[in-house]
Regions:
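A post-motif C-terminal structural segment
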Residues: 1-195
Length: 195
């Protein structure tokens, strides 16, 4: 929250949001209790903790709350959800965290897909970030949640590996094949504005 209220230019963006009718929630419980209206949720003073720092399922709960609130709008909605935790764990070379963050992200994606299944005029797009550190699964057992991974990039940097784009729902056919990541913007724009 400090990035919104303790700024060099002396603006307090939290107060500006309140002035525009937003409810400012400061915990996942507060976020979940909001039933209508405009919401700005800030669950950490600084950077969000990762899943190994007891963040728990607050990311999944936040996505659920956003979909529930935005779905009340008459003209539909556009929701962009970002998750930097898998990338951060890859840079750190932390196999356990990569796995746990991926499972957490999968739960959030599952909720979005469940929503799209019920609301036929919905498109869900899932885009990977830049691949980091060249993680390779050498062996393991998914049932036991036990894997052995190796990192192929010293220094834990981004690789040149292509990243996946998955789409489900109305217009998903526009997101097939290989494309530049900058093309995603134009394809989404064309769908939103029937171009």
């Amino acid at each position: 929250m400090k990035y919104f209220s303790s700024r060099e230019d002396q603006r307090n963006l939290l107060e500006e949001l309140r002035g525009k009718g937003f409810y400012i929630a400061k915990s996942i419980d507060e976020i979940q209790n909001v039933r209508s209206g405009n919401l700005a949720g800030f669950t950490s003073e600084d950077d969000m903790p990762d899943i190994l720092q007891e963040r728990g399922d607050s990311f999944v709960k936040s996505v659920y709350s956003a979909i529930r609130l935005l779905n009340q709008r008459e003209n539909g909605f556009f929701l962009l959800v970002g998750d930097m935790f898998v990338d951060r764990a890859s840079h750190a070379g932390n196999v356990e965290q990569v796995g746990l963050e991926t499972i957490n992200l999968d739960k959030a994606i599952g909720m979005a897909l469940d929503f799209a299944e019920k609301e036929e005029n919905t498109l869900v797009i899932v885009v990977g970030g830049p691949e980091a550190s060249g993680m390779t699964l050498v062996e393991g057992n998914l049932q036991d949640r036990n894997v052995v991974a190796k990192w192929t990039m010293p220094g834990m940097i981004h690789t040149g590996t292509m990243v996946p784009v998955f789409a489900y729902g109305v217009g998903s056919d526009k997101f097939q094949g290989i494309m530049k990541n900058t093309d995603l913007f134009f394809r989404i724009k064309n769908l939103l504005f029937n171009q």
